[in-house]
Amino acid sequence: MKKSLLALVALGAFAGAAHAQSSVTLYGIIDEGFIFNNNANGKHLYGLSSGVMQGSRFGLRGTEDLGGGLKAIFTLENGFDVNSGKLGQGGLMFGRQAYVGLSSPYGTVTLGRQYDSVVDFVGPLEAGDQWGGYIAAHPGDLDNFNNAYRVNNAIKYTSPSYAGFSFGGLYSLGGIAGQFARNQVWSLGAGYNNGPLVLGVGYLNARTPSNFGGMFNNGSSDPTTSGKLPVTTPVYGAYANSANTYQVIGAGGAYTFGAATIGATYSNTKFKGFSVGPFVNQTATFNNGEINFKYQLTPALILGAAYDYTQGSKINGSSAAKYHQGSLGVDYFLSKRTDVYVIGVYQHASGNTLDANGNVVQAHASINGLDPSSTSNQVAARVGIRHKF
């Protein structure tokens, strides 16, 4: 009897140890609230909107200890609309992220649908990623700092941190037989995070970026399953839909002193290789600069403010499109997992841009993620609640 009890205890201890070597975590965010747009194609818009501060999601994250410091990892992350229950990211089951890989003391290699290096290293320094949500992102999220687009079929390496310094890279296979370079996406980035100072730099290059009707929908044997997200923003949609190459160079930094953090970002976005329209054999360039400020007024209350300026290219002598944008935010934490927030954004546009047909038109204000204004000005306000689990 004693031997049987000892055997059961030993077996239970062994099973517990084996179980501890692997784990699967269910996590998620539910972000919901009221949003106001003072000019949605010429009309006021009041309504509920899901996922403004952060996209509503749930996911599974797992790891298995393989021994010797090597681990198998995976992430499957779904995006959804709280108001309708519909899938986000073009209807994909795991449209936000879906990858599997190996992690070791020498770095992590993952394969699947993932974020590019600009998102990883520069995106977190933008106001939209910190406290402003997607409506505080740069116009149309033209530099993808706010991860409007993911990369399919991607192989990615991320280094460990060396005294605060880390780096990484991503390459996405084009998936077109006989045309190795077509539809490919590649990206490189590096960052430094040590004490009060955070720095980031990144590069992104995508061939035929809007192939199959949406940014980065590359290399699928059945393109209808790749989560089409048509580029409809009037800020750069006409360029993205006809360019052969989309290129982003981004950099940013932030410094914390006491309860305050001041930061800045810069991006240079180019659309190259046009075959039709006013930019044939030319390059359309957008430069964006942002300064942002965050203040931890109390352990539960964060205040934020940001200003960013975007300038596009001149179109055959016409004045370049220019976008001035200011954002304010207040975020109050009811607990570690639940907060309520208020965000306000104002944008003013001037100059000229292209419409969907390639015609030169006056630039209109277009706050990211919202219906564009019918004039040069637009105001948006958001009151929301976010719960993490």
Where are these regions (language model features)?
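Gram-negative bacterial Sec-dependent N-terminal signal peptides
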Residues: 1-21
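Outer-membrane beta-barrel architecture
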Residues: 9, 59-61, 99-101, 156-158, ...
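Outer membrane beta-barrel
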Residues: 22-36, 46-177, 182-205, 345-349
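Extracellular loop and loop/strand-boundary signature of outer-membrane beta-barrel proteins
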Residues: 43-46, 86, 142, 174-175, ...
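Short sequence motifs at beta-strands and strand-loop junctions characteristic
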Residues: 50-53, 90-92, 147-149, 180-182, ...
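Detector for outer-membrane/organellar transmembrane beta-barrel domains
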Residues: 191-327, 331-332, 346
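Outer-membrane beta-barrel "beta-signal"
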Residues: 334, 375-389
